[in-house]
Curated annotation (Swiss-Prot):
<feature type="binding site">
    <location>
        <position position="63"/>
    </location>
    <ligand>
        <name>Zn(2+) 1</name>
    </ligand>
</feature>
<dbReference type="InterPro" id="IPR036866">
    <property type="entry name" value="RibonucZ/Hydroxyglut_hydro"/>
</dbReference>
<keyword id="KW-0255">Endonuclease</keyword>
<keyword id="KW-0378">Hydrolase</keyword>
<comment type="function">
    <text>Zinc phosphodiesterase, which displays some tRNA 3'-processing endonuclease activity. Probably involved in tRNA maturation, by removing a 3'-trailer from precursor tRNA.</text>
</comment>
<comment type="similarity">
    <text>Belongs to the RNase Z family.</text>
</comment>
<keyword id="KW-0862">Zinc</keyword>
<feature type="active site" description="Proton acceptor">
    <location>
        <position position="65"/>
    </location>
</feature>
<keyword id="KW-0479">Metal-binding</keyword>
<dbReference type="Pfam" id="PF12706">
    <property type="entry name" value="Lactamase_B_2"/>
</dbReference>
<dbReference type="InterPro" id="IPR013471">
    <property type="entry name" value="RNase_Z/BN"/>
</dbReference>
<dbReference type="InterPro" id="IPR001279">
    <property type="entry name" value="Metallo-B-lactamas"/>
</dbReference>
<protein>
    <recommendedName>
        <fullName>Ribonuclease Z</fullName>
        <ecNumber>3.1.26.11</ecNumber>
    </recommendedName>
</protein>
<feature type="binding site">
    <location>
        <position position="66"/>
    </location>
    <ligand>
        <name>Zn(2+) 2</name>
    </ligand>
</feature>
<keyword id="KW-0540">Nuclease</keyword>
<comment type="subunit">
    <text>Homodimer.</text>
</comment>
<feature type="binding site">
    <location>
        <position position="65"/>
    </location>
    <ligand>
        <name>Zn(2+) 2</name>
    </ligand>
</feature>
Amino acid sequence: MIEITLLGTGSPIPDPDRAGPSTLVRAGGQVFLVDCGRGVLQRAAAVGVGAAGLSAVLLTHLHSDHIAELGDVLITSWVTNFAADPAPLQVIGPPGTAETVEAMLKAFGRDIGYRIAHHADLNAPPPIEVHEYTDGTVWDRDGVAIRVAPTDHRPVAPTIGFRVEFDGASAVLAGGTVPCPSLDELAAGAGALVHTVIRKDIITNFPQQRVKDICDYHSSVQEAAATAARAGVGTLVMTHYVPAIIAGQEDQWRALAATEFGGRIELGNDLHRVEVHAR
């Protein structure tokens, strides 16, 4: 079984009720943090997960709302890990990830220096290993396998989606993307597809062109549902709601998805949990 927890279902727009985009995936005793939106560590704490307990951080792309708390994750995983010789935190993402991590650590350079000077058991900067991929297998440990494929979030590029597999169960995390053949292939037959969604029918009515522009590179609810249908997934899990879902609107969003997808449809608030079993 794979357990998916929507840690943050928000967007770049600050929302008092929704943290930034982030999803927790637990499989075979391993814990993966997919994207690092604002507030992610507080949401993770609510389900008993700390930064030092992460098996890896998986980044779909490098938009600010998806990496806003990456620096905090890197530092907190270091200062809260009390092992004598802690293993490096694994960070997996598209090309550009290593540069981004380096910049984050540089921004926290003074803090790192302060902590090394203060604590006798901290004698080196945070141990981080970064791996950049656009395609193929990126993880294969103790029965958990992860592979990636390109998605289409242009002009943001490159971007990737992740497929996590364990004991016959599978979950795909699409990140930000419009429909594309590579995502269809990655998601084919998966137990669940976690997909960012927007309401283009609402957004196109905004007067600001900058707001309308987000329709260029995000999937609408119906488009995400159509991707799920083409790929033959069991469950569509919607997240990254733009605009934010107002209480009482959930059935409306589900109905839009149901016009294109006949399977199980999941959406909800932060900390919404979905179990994915072998198919």
